[in-house]
């Protein structure tokens, strides 16, 4: 089945219009996680060059995002994107009436029929989710919504202490989530404020669905630690610590007299990959 899904995936990509949201970086040709991080940081840094300005970054957390997609809504959006009816009907049939059961050793639960969500581990699911959220775009030009699969970040560029556009954007996003059956987890949603002004005032917290969003000094965004001073100290320390821990295993392998080729492969896969992760953002 996965082989056929790959064929459908390749065909679906050729049917997509070039006008898709440019700030969705997952599962798009010539786009990557590094591009999403660079875009977010460039947007913030460029704005901070202006007088009396600061940036609020809201890192949205969804509860089981893939499991809450409503197939009928997805098909409607695919139709708006110009996907032909035959392909839409196939996708709807693929996502509907899916039997599911749980097996533990020799015991199997009763079968449950699912009509909501895109199955995790499915070849098509990541792209289908990205297309489901294609219309999650900012309503104000002073805001940017950066998306990478189900990781969504609202970047509010604030000038002269006027946060009205940013706060309206957050409320608009909350309404969009409710309309699209996505459960916005306010407890795990975090906000980071970058304010280099000498006389920065007190920042009023953001509330979503009546619950206050926690403000943090740093946040791990797509694997990279971003701090409120926009320095790389925390991220670098974290990478070095992680690499140092894995060096212990490399030493153990060396003591076991494994071949240099195996040791080199282990180093490149488990240590060098950490140190070079998102290195373009550090340059």
Which sequence ranges carry the predicted segments?
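Secondary-structure capping and boundary motifs in well-ordered enzyme cores
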Residues: 1-4, 29-36, 66, 116-125, ...
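Conserved pre-catalytic core of RNA-dependent polymerases
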Residues: 1-118, 156
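Inter-domain linker/hinge segments that demarcate the starts of reverse transcriptase
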Residues: 7-12, 36-47, 163-180, 244
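Mobile genetic element proteins and their domesticated derivatives, centered on retroelements
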Residues: 8, 12, 40, 61, ...
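Active-site palm subdomain of RNA-directed nucleic acid polymerases
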Residues: 8-24, 126-155
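Non-catalytic, peripheral interaction segments enriched in hydrophobic/basic residues
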Residues: 148-149, 178-202, 223-283
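Short, conserved micro-motifs composed of acidic
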Residues: 158, 171, 183-217
